[in-house]
Curated annotation (Swiss-Prot):
Source organism of this protein record: Aspergillus terreus (strain NIH 2624 / FGSC A1156)
Ranges where the record places region Disordered: 50-100, 141-169
Designated gene of the protein: gedR
Biased composition (Polar residues): 51-71, 153-164
Protein task: Transcription factor that regulates the expression of the gene cluster that mediates the biosynthesis of geodin, an intermediate in the biosynthesis of other natural products.
Assigned GO CC terms: nucleus
One example GO MF annotation: zinc ion binding
Organismal lineage: Eukaryota, Fungi, Dikarya, Ascomycota, Pezizomycotina
Protein name: Geodin cluster transcription factor
Main location: nucleus
DNA-binding region: 12-39
A GO biological process held by the record: positive regulation of metabolic process
PROSITE patterns tied to this protein: ZN2_CY6_FUNGAL_1, ZN2_CY6_FUNGAL_2
InterPro entries for this protein: OAF3, Zn2-C6_fun-type_DNA-bd_sf, Zn2Cys6_DnaBD
Amino acid sequence: MSAEGHKLRGSCHACAASKVRCSKEKPTCSRCSKRGTTCEYLITKRPGRKQLNNRSTAKESSNTTRTSLATVPQGLLEPDPMSTAIPLADQPPWSPPGTTPSSLDVFSSLFDSAEGSWSLPLADWDNEVDEYLTHLAMPRTANSEPLDAEGGITSSHNTSSNSPARPPTLQPVCPQLTCVAQSTFPAPGQCRGTSPTLVLYLSQQCAGSVEAADHQRSAGRLHIRRPAR
């Protein structure tokens, strides 16, 4: 090894160039001595033990890390699943995505009120319709007869003995309802003082009686005329 501390090659330059085995004698090998050539030992380009030292240092550091991790208590590395579990009694109630408890309460209250309005039996519907027809203002013209609560002509209205008897004339109950024969009905909410549900029910009932009204009118037993505007 030279004074600068660099490592020399094991074979001389002449033997290495000829690719023969060198006796590695210094300062001159036996082959160079026999041939009378200059025997030189060049500096090697490989780092040698320096790379080996780096590998050993890396292994030592990894071993040290493993040893330090092994000495740490297990509870500090990962939490105990039993200690972090939330009791079922303390968990908040589940709600669908995009909803809040307040919105659910409002929706349930609206649904209950709507369900209660549609849960009336058929007999209660008939009583409500009769009461509505009784208290509803019945418009009359100058030539029309007064109607009683049942929709017929009152007995107190007597015509003159000289005037000919006229056939009874039916007047519309709701001003917005046109002639039944035309099958036209108002939208819910157009009749004042009436709930949309009741108007919808009246429209359905009137639609079912159109066919019967046409049959009676063709037989000459029912005369329907338009109300005076």
